[in-house]
Amino acid sequence: MRAALLTLAFTALAAAADDATTTVGFFGGGEWENSNDDDSLPLIPSYTSIGASVVDVNAVETVLAISCLEGAATESCSINDPWTMTQGISSFSWYAEYTAFDWNPPVTATLDYNCAYENYTLSATCTYSMSYSGSSDGAETSTSFSTETSWDSVATYAALEVTGGLDKFNQPEATETPEGGAGFAGPIQAMVTAAPVLAAGLLASHASGAWRKGKILLIKPFKGILPRLARLEASVKSPNPYRNEPLTPNLDIRAPSSGQCNASLYTRHHPGCFDDDIDSLGQVVLSSQVLGVFFNRLCRVEFVCPDAQFACRECQPVFVDIHCNDVPSTKLPCCRGRKQTNRPCPKNKHILAWLELCKAEAMHRDSKGLKDNAFVKPYVVGELVAEVPRQAEKGRQRAMDNIARSRNCGKGHVRT
């Protein structure tokens, strides 16, 4: 069985023409894996010209009814019964039935998408199913597809035009928690109106004319522009999803037979922020060896775009976050762009200098525990117990000196 990567790119990009129209966001999920035995991916019958109306909103969930925009041609949008979409603080559901007349033969399709999650960016489990069938002039077609997956962190969300019921966001019920429900301060509108609007603008700036016209593409092969959009959306949604994630493989020092636990350095390359040379740092193994025992530590470099609406424009302020096990994160402010070339993003050699400090910090911390480690004691004699921490401290200081030299270019920014 070969796995095919998919992405859910739920998008309805439509400009707000007047005060009666706005754009809200909804849960888009992450990267999907096709569990079918073959590599073929079902095409999703297309539709355009849809809009939503707010049915109900409270502090726990927002319910939307989705139908065709007024005056939409039947060929682009044919919905008999409005779709129901429910965006909650811990769940999401969307059920849709429609007819796609631009297919030959025309088909009637059904989509069913349900998710449960810890919050909008963490611990999501989703099921998705789709089926369609149709016949005309002797031609017949039908298919069905379903999948289920889960993610530790969620990468995407999407935008949808809302043309009715906006006054419900301003009603007292919008901030009230239903009986038996667990709400939060303020209606879910805060989630569905702010960042997703930004994502819609980003998608419009990168995507084809069909996307800008509001065409919705549900499941497409994970290739081409879609993975770039997914990563860019992730930088808007959660600039640093690994902030609270454990950063060590936790190699058991009492079991050296487990061998060297190789820990990779992960880089997140956000379009519009960094040149491709950053990708050469994709795999770096950091390990320190003390008296034949491996002390492995995972260091991660995180490329963050906090102002993602300016991505791919003239000057993109970014941060490089360097994480190391039990070592505080280090932020390097820099700028990639034409306007402020005096504040460039760090080159590989400067990032590697920080990684050396990360490695030295881990080794120094490990070495200080040698005296009390029951496994190491039989192999440590006299001055070796003191010498290892001294050497580790020297390495730590040397790395810090290198960092000081590399950043000595004014305003604390890393020079190239």
Curated annotation (Swiss-Prot):
Domain of life according to the entry: Eukaryota
Signal sequence coordinates: 1-16
Biotechnology: Notoamides have been shown to exhibit antitumoral activities. Notoamides A-C show moderate cytotoxicity against HeLa and L1210 cells with IC(50) values in the range of 22-52 mg/ml, but the IC(50) value of notoamide D is greater than 100 mg/ml. Moreover, notoamide C induces G2/M-cell cycle arrest at a concentration of 6.3 mg/ml.
UniProt keywords, alphabetically: Glycoprotein, Signal
Keyword check for Glycoprotein: yes
Residues modified by glycosylation: 119, 262
Entry function: Part of the gene cluster that mediates the biosynthesis of notoamide, a fungal indole alkaloid that belongs to a family of natural products containing a characteristic bicyclo[2.2.2]diazaoctane core. The first step of notoamide biosynthesis involves coupling of L-proline and L-tryptophan by the bimodular NRPS notE', to produce cyclo-L-tryptophan-L-proline called brevianamide F.
Name assigned to this protein: Notoamide biosynthesis cluster protein N'
Lineage, highest ranks first: Eukaryota, Fungi, Dikarya, Ascomycota, Pezizomycotina
